[in-house]
Amino acid sequence: MCASVKYNIRGPALIPRMKTKHRIYYITLFSIVLLGLIATGMFQFWPHSIESSGDWSVEKRTGRDVPLVRLPADSPVPERGDLSCRMHTCFDVYRCGFNPKNKIKVYIYPLKKYVGEAGVPVSSTISREYNELLTAISDSDYYTDDVTRACLFVPSIDLLNQNSLRVKETAQALAQLSRWDRGTNHLLFNMLPGGPPDYNTALDVPRDRALLAGGGFSTWTYRQGYDVSIPVYSPLSAEVDLPEKGPGPRRYFLLSSQVALHPEYREDLAALQARHGEAVLVLDKCSNLSEGVPAARRRCHQQQAFDYPQVLQEATFCMVLRGARLGQAVLSDVLRAGCVPVIIADSYVLPFSEVLDWKRASVVVPEEKMSDVYSILQSIPRRQIEEMQRQARWFWEAYFQSIKAIALATLQIINDRIYPYAAISYEDWNDPPAVKWGSVSNPLFLPLIPPQSQGFTAIVLTYDRVESLFRVITEVSKVPSLSKLLVVWNNQNKNPPEDSLWPKIRVPLKVVRTAENKLSNRFFPYDEIETEAVLAIDDDIIMLTSDELQFGYEVWREFPDRLVGYPGRLHLWDHEMNKWKYESEWTNEVSMVLTGAAFYHKYFNYLYTYKMPGDIKNWVDAHMNCEDIAMNFLVANVTGKAVIKVTPRKKFKCPECTAIDGLSLDQTHMVERSECINKFASVFGTMPLKVVEHRADPVLYKDDFPEKLKSFPNIGSL
């Protein structure tokens, strides 16, 4: 009891001290947390250091903001450009890594001001053009601000014009870059290389293994497949409003607008003008211009002044001659005007020649043939000239009109080298949008790997055999690679079954009702076909297993320009009748696979519907026969290749079908098959079908191997 009283007496004296200590502790802890939050917020909103990789733009910087880097006189200098460099020897593709979007990542170094030991700047202030170039890259899908993810590195050192550089000190600045590593995976942009008196055709700054996107390369300095030849940008053609002029003959047949040309060229041009009179116009700089008129905007012939570059639109052909440098900005002006450039500059590597087909937009004439240039140009057909005029204008719009266009085209070329299976096609580089929108991609120019949109679309042509149709749908739906099933309902007198009656399958099923009962309806390029691969299958082909169909699709992926199918047939020459004969009996050879069950590229639907020679398509529809033979002729004629028969199965007769169910069971129908071959051979003017003696089977087919370990165990019987 006494102890209890004693405790109660002392208790009240201890409790306030404990509360005070705890209060001080929590206040201190709260203060620390609050200060931490304030500091974090200030860090987030306070201007970051210049080392922030994304903050390089000169528009965001003043001279005080840019860190100064002083280069000692004995700073290391990179080796001269290695002329032996190629992508497989000097480029580290492993830095690019796996990228599901097949896009390289480009890192731009933070902006810094480099000065020599005496404090003299290495180069002039960053130019507007180079700032636009870096901005274009940073705004593109290629850009990354994470240096560890970068595949390509671009310095913020302006190298566009060598005249504004101190060559040695610039090289020393490059060597100071944190990821330089002898220039590996570094991209340098230069449009005006060399300097007096030699004017070399490549940047004189030592750069070791760095890639060079240069204007004015010669074949002696250009590392094919490594460097990128780019245009010399013309601000004049980019800034002047020059409405497009339609193709066709113009006032002058040939025009020269360059100033400060070599005297020998001037003599040749004068001789051309004297020989051909007003058809040739030779311009030079103007000597007596009114005050305030920019000299760059005028050209003169004798005492007559012309607005430049507007005068270029008055000529059919415009000459582009070598000057002190091989690359000339006049090429951009000429393309903008829709004038066909006549390039007379031996060894000049044309801009983006790795991907652009300059034969479609220009005429290249050797310097020694300059006196014959007029007769050479006269030999070009008028229609070809008009096409070249359109192509010239398109090249300017797509690749020359801005620094951004030049930068992105350069990165796309490098991207295509690193991810060749996803490279842009020849047509995409060279065809104007109007041409591309009106055409279909040719399957003969497919990527090196199958498209990412895996799978195939099964097209079932049917009339009224609903029961067997449903069985076909059920069996085909078991194939793992099936993407969509399209039923072509060819019966105009009967409606398809109600939606609730159709088999429930895992992929979309679409029914298309046709306006007329035509066999060619199965080969129409329906919008619903979204995959590259198409499986044409009849509504009575109920015997094929899912393994057989999946294996057939895998074979097609290896040979996407072939007809890959199951029922094999042969054409033979009948010596007694002196004509072709259709053979359906089992033989050692095959020249056709019937499209009652066959894979092919969807492009051939387009060709069958719109490009089938002669009256074959109408003949097929009128006779209700031979659409499959017509497709075999078409594919063989386009590709020059044989069909591929897959799996050993030879019997494709529907066991439940009666004699009146199928067209192919009619004797007259079989006789017409031979007539079809002769008819089609006559229309094509040749026999395109190729005879082969092999078929494709799974690797372990008939091997004494556990079935469960085979990829395609259920290939079926004959």
Swiss-Prot record:
Gene3D superfamilies: Spore Coat Polysaccharide Biosynthesis Protein SpsA, Chain A (3.90.550.10). Its cofactor is Mn(2+). One of its GO terms (molecular function) is glucuronosyl-N-acetylglucosaminyl-proteoglycan 4-alpha-N-acetylglucosaminyltransferase activity. A soluble form is generated by proteolytic processing. N-glycosylated at Asn-637. The chain crosses the membrane at residues 26-46. GO terms for cellular component: catalytic complex; endoplasmic reticulum; endoplasmic reticulum membrane; extracellular space; Golgi apparatus; Golgi membrane; membrane. It is found in: Golgi apparatus membrane; Golgi apparatus, cis-Golgi network membrane; Endoplasmic reticulum membrane; Secreted. It holds the Pfam family Glyco_transf_64. Its EC number is 2.4.1.224. It is an enzyme of class 2 (transferase). It is a single-pass type II membrane protein. A protein binds at residues 582, 584, 651, 653. UDP-N-acetyl-alpha-D-glucosamine binds at residues 465, 490, 517, 522, 538-540, 627-628, 673. Glycans are attached at residues 288, 637. GO terms for biological process: heparan sulfate proteoglycan biosynthetic process; protein glycosylation. Residues 47-718 are lumenal. Mn(2+) binds at residue 540. UDP binds at residues 461, 465, 490, 517, 538-539. Disulfide bonds join 85-90, 96-151, 286-300, 318-339, 626-676. Part of the heparan sulfate polymerase, a dimeric complex composed of EXT1 and EXT2. Could also form homooligomeric complexes. Interacts with NDST1. Interacts with GALNT5. This is Exostosin-2. It comes from Bos taurus.
